[in-house]
């Protein structure tokens, strides 16, 4: 049986790689990418159960990537979680907050991540 797939997108390579490694250790099949365009491609190619998108990324920010993922996947988009140090009322998140199913704050706390994973269909197998 295959493991649930998660895409982690953050322009901070260390942060993306660390989170993907943690998710792998937790039993998920996690892939790290480093900008919004890569996130859109990964979601299109890999059909993940969950995508965790940093809001402020180069080339295509997290909100624009979420919009494109939703448009391209036509109802089959993964659960989308924003990951940001911004407050919800801050730009650019406020204009795109409805694009995400949930929001995570930086620095990411393990209990928040565990809660998100428990609420998703992304279950380790």
Where are these regions (language model features)?
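Non-catalytic signal-transmission and effector/linker regions of two-component phosphorelay proteins
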Residues: 1-7, 20, 109-125
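Conserved sequence signature across two-component system core domains
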Residues: 9-10, 33, 51
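Two-component/phosphorelay signaling modules centered on CheY-like receiver
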Residues: 13-31
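Acidic catalytic/metal-coordinating carboxylates
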Residues: 34-38, 61-65
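Active-site beta3 strand of CheY-like receiver
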Residues: 46-52
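Active-site residues of response regulator receiver
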Residues: 54, 84
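Receiver (REC) domain active-site loop signature in two-component systems and cognate sites
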Residues: 57
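Alpha4 helix (beta4-alpha4-beta5 surface) of REC/receiver domains from two-component response regulators
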Residues: 64, 86-106, 111, 115
